[in-house]
Amino acid sequence: MGKDNKEHKESKESKTVDNYEARMPAVLPFAKPLASKKLNKKVLKTVKKASKAKNVKRGVKEVVKALRKGEKGLVVIAGDISPADVISHIPVLCEDHSVPYIFIPSKQDLGAAGATKRPTSVVFIVPGSNKKKDGKNKEEEYKESFNEVVKEVQAL
């Protein structure tokens, strides 16, 4: 029983990587900078680790509120949102507050990485937002990958 579940997880992960090209036609024209296949995988892993440490804000309202409050981190935006007006203001807001942002091709992948069953349009990774003491170990786990991703995003 446990073995089947593991195999199911592995096939699910490989599916998301294989679907990168399949999801490209649905990406919005203003979705720039768009993550490459390799960076997309790295970003999703970082989101997954950050959500385990409870250091993510999900959804447009939460992300906009956090940006206006001046929190720092990384904004990950899904590039296949319809209608586009839902997220069109977020890149401008990020640039105003000098917060790095990146687009990824799929809202389904972003939702799955963010530990929700629903597709998610925007995720804001805010390191250190979890004030609990037990979150320290989990935070250290993803901090390194978070810093790597931020450097790559700023290079784009």
UniProtKB/Swiss-Prot annotation:
Function summary: Non-catalytic component of the H/ACA small nucleolar ribonucleoprotein (H/ACA snoRNP), which catalyzes pseudouridylation of rRNA and is required for ribosome biogenesis. This involves the isomerization of uridine such that the ribose is subsequently attached to C5, instead of the normal N1. Pseudouridine ('psi') residues may serve to stabilize the conformation of rRNAs. The H/ACA snoRNP complex also mediates pseudouridylation of other types of RNAs. The H/ACA snoRNP complex mediates pseudouridylation at position 93 in U2 snRNA. Essential for growth. Directly binds H/ACA snoRNAs.
Pfam families, per the entry: Ribosomal_L7Ae
Keyword rRNA processing listed: yes
Compartments it resides in: Nucleus, Nucleolus
MF terms in GO: box H/ACA snoRNA binding
GO biological process: box H/ACA snoRNP assembly; rRNA processing; rRNA pseudouridine synthesis; snoRNA guided rRNA pseudouridine synthesis; snRNA pseudouridine synthesis
SUBUNIT field: Component of the small nucleolar ribonucleoprotein particles containing H/ACA-type snoRNAs (H/ACA snoRNPs). The protein component of the H/ACA snoRNP contains CBF5, GAR1, NHP2 and NOP10. The complex contains a stable core composed of CBF5 and NOP10, to which GAR1 and NHP2 subsequently bind. Interacts with SHQ1. Interacts with NAF1.
Primary localization class, coarse: nucleus
Record-linked InterPro entries: eL8/uL1-like (IPR050257), H/ACA_rnp_Nhp2-like (IPR002415), Ribosomal_eL30-like_sf (IPR029064), Ribosomal_eL8-like_CS (IPR004037), Ribosomal_eL8/eL30/eS12/Gad45 (IPR004038), Ribosomal_eL8/Nhp2 (IPR018492)
Swiss-Prot/TrEMBL keywords: Nucleus, Ribonucleoprotein, Ribosome biogenesis, RNA-binding, rRNA processing
Gene Ontology, cellular component aspect: box H/ACA snoRNP complex; nucleolus; sno(s)RNA-containing ribonucleoprotein complex
Keyword Ribonucleoprotein on entry: yes
Name by which UniProt lists this protein: H/ACA ribonucleoprotein complex subunit NHP2
Mutagenesis or variant effect for G59E: Significant growth impairment at 30 and 37 degrees Celsius. Impaired association with H/ACA snoRNAs
